[in-house]
Structure formats: structure tokens, C-alpha cells
Amino acid sequence: KPRPGQFFGLM
């Protein structure tokens, strides 16, 4: 399960 920081980091 990806962390919120990783999700926004990809964007």
C-alpha cells in the first residue's frame, strides 16, 4: 500500500 507522499511524488 503506497504512502500519501509517494502518490503525490509520482504526480
Curated annotation (Swiss-Prot):
The entry's localization annotation reads: Secreted
Q: Where is it mostly found? A: secreted
User: Which keywords does the record carry?
Assistant: Amidation, Neuropeptide, Neurotransmitter, Secreted
For the keyword Secreted, the answer is yes
Gene Ontology process terms (BP): chemical synaptic transmission; neuropeptide signaling pathway
- What GO terms fall under cellular component here? extracellular region; synapse
Where are the Methionine amide modifications?
M11
Describe the function of this protein.
Tachykinins are active peptides which excite neurons, evoke behavioral responses, are potent vasodilators and secretagogues, and contract (directly or indirectly) many smooth muscles.
Family from the record: Belongs to the tachykinin family.
- The protein, known as: Substance P
> Which organism was this protein described from?
Scyliorhinus canicula (Small-spotted catshark)
